[in-house]
Amino acid sequence: VLAAENQMPSWHVEPAQSMPDFTTLVLKKRMEELLEEPCRTSLEHTSLPAWLPKRRWFAGKDTAIDTVRIAYGVRFGDPQHPVLLSEIEVTSAGHTSRYQLPFGFIAEDQVGPALPQQLALARVRRVRQVGLITDAFSLEAFIRAVLQGMQNNTVLESSEGEIRFAPTAQLEKLGLGAESEVRYLSAEQSNSSVVVGNSLVLKLIRKVASGVHPELEMSAYLTEAGFANISPLLGSVIRRDAQGEDNLLMIAQGYLSNQGDAWEWTQNNLERALRDELADAMSEQEQHYNALGDHQQ
């Protein structure tokens, strides 16, 4: 049975009609070459300004982009699945916002989920291999690398501060590993989320801001206090900048199985309320007609 368009689940992604006419970048060997000329200029001036307004998590869709700057990029993951952890600064109408966008690589003919190709932003030629630069969050290898980073207390040095992967005591108890299932909750939201092993939700924070993050602070406090009726905090990825301010990049929490999300719950309750109202209205109308019939008799 085929679902109608308005019945598609929340994780549904419209298939790409055709591959865009991407700019082709040339790399000799390393992903870090994306940060060097001429690749950097091509990404900042052409690829990213065209790609960002199509993303649901990008807050500046209604304003023309003035400039895009890649703030930093640091190598992460294994050599078979190269990734650059990165943040970009976008200036529109005199206001600058910072977003997290990890860059990943996939072979153009790679067989697998459609999402990495749908989120691609540039074509790349590396020696004899042709592929695509995409949002690394769409790659399962990246998700597994982040989980491993938390488990190993990985620390990365970047030009804008130290990036720390930190677990809580709760994470080890889950026994998650390389074989744990990775399941995306939704293609894109204001942030990006994925479920690992049906027990952990990893959320990548898209719009990055310095200072205490309320979700992390509350989750850490309630988990430490042993509060049972929450998703426990399992880990985090934080960049500490030159001013000593923390910038939350990712947060891992326990996954609570449920029957849909808040949007579906709201829709279902509205539907039931409308149905009840219509039923009551029909009942009153029937009583009115019956009363008229009795009067005429």
Cite the ranges covered by each PLM segment.
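Short Lys/Arg-enriched alpha/beta "domain-start" segment
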Residues: M19-T67
